A protein has these predicted regions:
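P-loop (Walker A) phosphate-binding loop of NTP-binding proteins
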Residues: 10
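ATP-binding Walker
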Residues: 13
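Walker A/P-loop
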Residues: 16
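Conserved substrate/cofactor phosphate-moiety recognition/catalytic segment
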Residues: 24-75
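Glycine-rich phosphate-binding loop used to anchor ATP phosphates in small-molecule kinases
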Residues: 69-176
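Conserved phosphate-donor/acceptor-positioning beta-strand/loop module used by diverse small-molecule
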Residues: 145-148, 165-203
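NTP-dependent small-molecule kinase module
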Residues: 203-207, 213-258
Length: 258
């Protein structure tokens, strides 16, 4: 069975770059690797620009948009009674208007207009994770996820539900419970100066300068992350990437794995 690696940390610490480099190095050593970075719409356990629809709503969409029926089915995640429809591939829409807007109105977690209740959000997440991890084969050595365990779920819970630390911890524990005895490790990238790291990341990405409110959000996110790691009872490593220490971080993770 594959070993599962969760690469975590607040925004701007270099998670996606490290996932790409780690994937390349492991493949170079002969390992079979599947990995997903942020905004990869093929990620089986993460959701960005994904609509949640009931069975009745899904049937209605299929009926009203017969020309898009094949595409709808292609980009739908089915789990229990749940239908999740991915409608963007990064900046590229997967559907035309007006169907695209209808799906956007049903966004599941990324700045949703009408968030589902927190209990339903957790149930949907767990159902998708349980289905995916219960059907893993033997053909892959490593599965590497960029921010799928802590980064995106905790962002959702803080921004959309104003969840407290105990609620966040409960959700993450339940997600990890869907993995059963599957071997996994959390590698958490940390930096001594969150504000400075965010500023560098925004400059590199040609984004607007960070605001004081944004810095405060990520400091609170970091505190929530540390609370979860302290109490979640999982195998994790804190990896220091202060002072551009990504090369050392990569070598440390590789040494830990192989």
């Amino acid at each position: 069975m594959p070993k599962i690696l969760f690469i975590e940390g607040v925004s701007g610490v270099g998670k996606s770059t490290l996932v790409r480099r780690l994937t390349e190095r492991l493949r170079g050593q002969g390992y079979s690797v599947k990995s997903w970075v942020e905004f990869d719409f093929t990620n089986p356990i993460d959701f960005y620009c994904t609509a949640v629809v009931s069975s009745e709503e899904y049937e209605d969409l299929c009926s009203r948009y017969p020309a898009s029926l094949e595409t709808l089915r292609q980009y739908t995640v089915f789990a229990d009674d749940i239908k999740l429809v991915r409608y963007y591939n990064e900046d590229t829409p997967l559907f035309e208007q007006p169907l695209l807007s209808e799906l956007w109105d049903r966004e599941f977690c990324y700045e949703p207009k009408n968030p589902v209740p927190l209990s339903e959000y957790a149930r949907i997440y767990q159902a998708v994770w349980r289905q995916y991890f219960s059907t893993l084969g033997q053909e892959t050595d490593y599965l590497i996820f960029d921010g799928s365990l802590l980064h995106h779920p905790i962002n959702d819970m803080m921004r959309n539900y104003h969840a407290d630390k105990e609620q966040i911890l409960c959700h993450i524990r339940q997600l990890l419970g869907t993995l059963g005895s599957q071997e996994r490790t959390i590698y958490y990238l940390r930096t001594d100066d969150i504000a400075a790291q965010l500023a560098r990341a925004h400059t590199d990405r040609r984004q607007n300068p960070t605001s004081a409110k944004e810095v405060e959000f990520w400091r609170q996110r970091y505190e929530n992350d540390q609370f979860v790691l302290q109490w979640v009872d999982e195998n994790f490593q804190i990896v220091d990437v202060s002072n551009k220490g990504w090369n050392n971080a990569l070598e440390m993770i590789l040494a830990d794995l192989v």
